[in-house]
C-alpha cells in the first residue's frame, strides 16, 4: 500500500514526439516544449529521465519529487528499452562491441566505459510515428533494440557514434514493465500510483 504522500502525487506517461524538449520552459522561443502538448498537467509536474530533443517515446512525468532519486540512482538498476535506427549495416562484431561496453565521453566525468548491455538487430518497428525525415528509410541502415540498465546523457547516440554508425532515430519504448502501449506521439496517459510503482518495480 502506497503512503498518503504517494497517493496525493500524480503520475503520467507521454509518448514524446520528435523535435520537442523534455521540459516546460526554455529561453529560446523556437523550441517545442512539454507545455505545447494538448494536456493540462498539474502544477509541479516535471519529467524524469529526459529524452533529448530529437529522441522519441516513453517519458515519465510526475509531481512526485522522490521519483528521480528512486528511479535514476546509480545503485537502482532498471531496464530501459530503446529501438534505434543507425546508418549503414552493422556487423555482428560491432554489435558485440556495443554489448561488451565501449568507451564514450561524458561531459562531467570524461572517459567512461559503458556497462554491458543487450543489443540486437530487429525489423523496422510497426506503427512508427511520422517524422519529416522520409530519406531515413532510403539510406542504408540497421534497426536495433538496446536494453540498458544505465542512462548516461545521450549514451546510445555516443555509443553508436564511436563505432561509426550514427544514430538517426531513437525511441524509448519501455522502462521495466512500464511501456507505451497504444499511446500515439503527443498523447498522455495518467496512471494510478499503485500501477505506476508496480510496473517500475518500486516499493
What is each model feature region?
Residues 2-203:
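RNA pseudouridine synthases
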Amino acid at each position: 500500500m502506497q503512503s498518503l504522500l504517494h497517493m496525493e502525487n500524480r503520475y503520467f506517461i507521454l509518448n514524446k514526439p520528435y523535435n520537442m524538449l523534455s521540459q516546460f520552459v526554455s529561453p529560446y522561443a523556437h523550441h517545442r516544449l512539454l507545455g505545447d502538448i494538448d494536456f493540462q498537467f498539474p502544477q509541479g509536474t516535471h519529467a524524469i529521465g529526459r529524452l533529448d530533443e530529437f529522441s522519441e517515446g516513453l517519458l515519465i512525468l510526475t509531481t512526485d519529487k522522490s521519483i528521480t532519486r528512486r528511479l535514476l540512482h546509480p545503485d537502482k538498476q532498471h531496464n530501459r528499452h530503446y529501438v534505434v535506427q543507425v546508418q549503414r549495416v552493422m556487423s555482428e562484431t560491432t554489435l558485440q562491441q556495443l554489448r561488451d561496453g565501449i568507451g564514450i565521453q561524458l561531459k562531467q566525468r570524461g572517459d567512461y566505459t559503458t556497462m554491458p548491455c543487450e543489443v540486437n538487430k530487429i525489423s523496422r518497428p510497426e506503427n512508427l510515428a511520422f517524422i519529416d525525415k522520409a530519406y531515413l528509410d532510403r539510406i542504408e541502415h540497421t534497426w536495433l533494440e538496446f536494453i540498458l540498465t544505465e542512462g548516461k546523457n545521450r549514451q546510445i547516440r555516443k555509443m553508436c557514434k564511436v563505432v561509426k554508425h550514427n544514430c538517426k532515430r531513437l525511441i524509448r519504448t519501455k522502462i521495466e514493465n512500464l511501456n507505451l502501449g497504444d499511446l500515439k506521439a503527443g498523447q498522455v496517459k495518467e496512471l494510478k500510483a499503485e500501477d505506476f510503482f508496480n510496473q517500475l518495480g518500486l516499493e
